Amino acid sequence: MVFKQLVDDDLGCASYLIGDEAAGEAVVVDPAYAIEPYLEAAEDEGLRIVRVLETHTHADHVSGHGRFALEYGLPVAIHPLAEPEYPSGPIEDGDEVLVGSIPIRVLHTPGHRPEHCCFLVEGHLLTGDSLMIGDAARPDLAVEAREGAEDLFRSLERLAGLPDETEIDPGHTGGSLCGASLSRERVSTLRMEKLSNHALAIEDVQEFVAHSTGIAAPRPPTVERVVDLNRGPFLAAQPPLELLDSVQGQLLDVRPAREHAAGHAHGAINIPLEGGSVGTKAGFVLDHATPVTIHARSPEEAADAARRLYAVGLLDVAGYAMGLESSEHLEPVGIDELERLVAADSVEVVDVREKDERDEGYIPGSRHIPYRLIRAFRDELDNGRPVVTVCSSGARAGVAASVLAAEGVDARPVLDGGIDNWQERGNQVTAFRRCGSG
């Protein structure tokens, strides 16, 4: 059997190619919108892809099943509770789907979504968005969170009854918004998860509900849009990008942060390709109702950025531009300068990390606004004082500062390092103290 995991690092999504070498046939499980990697992997193994299997209707990324169906005539199979608007072959609990002579067993495992299924094939358990490595999937993207958590608890109980040596092949890795505490490991075993995964160790349903609903990751703002696209009629490939003479709609600058800071066009929002998670960040800070022009260093980088936007349902990309007039600048702040500015109380420091990160320690007097919410606080921050944005590495701080600057706020990012570097230099941080912590 050919078994290959393919990971989209930008979104933390994992897909799988399963093939029977003797028959020369393969299936793809949970394909991403960009289907070329699966075609290349199949060709490398001398296989022909004959079917697409979906564990569920994805809420965080656009599936490639429509492209496989429209471009290659492949059938798509999903549980009927997904209520797809496209032609599909329904799969039910206990069914076996053959790839050549290899049976893939279907296990209905609701929780993340009502239609969710896992696939068991020759000791591999493709868990989709159910049992993850280090945690379980979030239960709040399709139904009321408590209902989803109760279903997920029962599904995990079922999976825990499989042999301990079963390999766990998840649908997501760390960096995905489909779970709160996911490991960046890509493969595990059921035995290892029983030893290390707190979600799998919980034996009481109410305790599990409290665990699952109390630490949910931020809800992607594109959820409804992406679900509609994945449930709706097959989505074809987007047309090639056009080189534009002028900016249409909003401007997304995907060049490195320091290039953007040194000079950029008016109104540009900077989400560098090199920083990763471009689609996720764009979903939070771009206006979904306005076309996007991509400012890139090359046509190839523009196409890469567009692919990442399409993957989260942002399909209205007008085209790309290169060499735009650099009429505006951002002035980055180093940690040493930040020390002086804070001591003089001459800036407003905005911590753009998530709450769990900030609770571990933050700059005294700093304000907390996660980067994904920064636009909503624009008016409160435009008060005559310069704003300095800070995170853990500089990546989110740069995005947040560019959003504020595009809105006319005097904003400067800490691009090199963040809170850890501040603390390493002997500066004070304040940590959130939980009850009973000392």
Task: Enumerate the predicted regions with their spans.
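Core dinuclear metal-dependent hydrolase active-site scaffold
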Residues: 3-6, 16-17, 96-121, 125, ...
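Divalent metal-coordination and catalytic microenvironments
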Residues: 18, 30, 56, 68, ...
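Active-site neighborhood of phospho(di)ester-bond hydrolases with catalytic His/Asp-centered motifs
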Residues: 28-29, 48-58, 77-81, 108-111, ...
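Active-site metal-binding motif and surrounding structural segment of the metallo-beta-lactamase
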Residues: 33-77
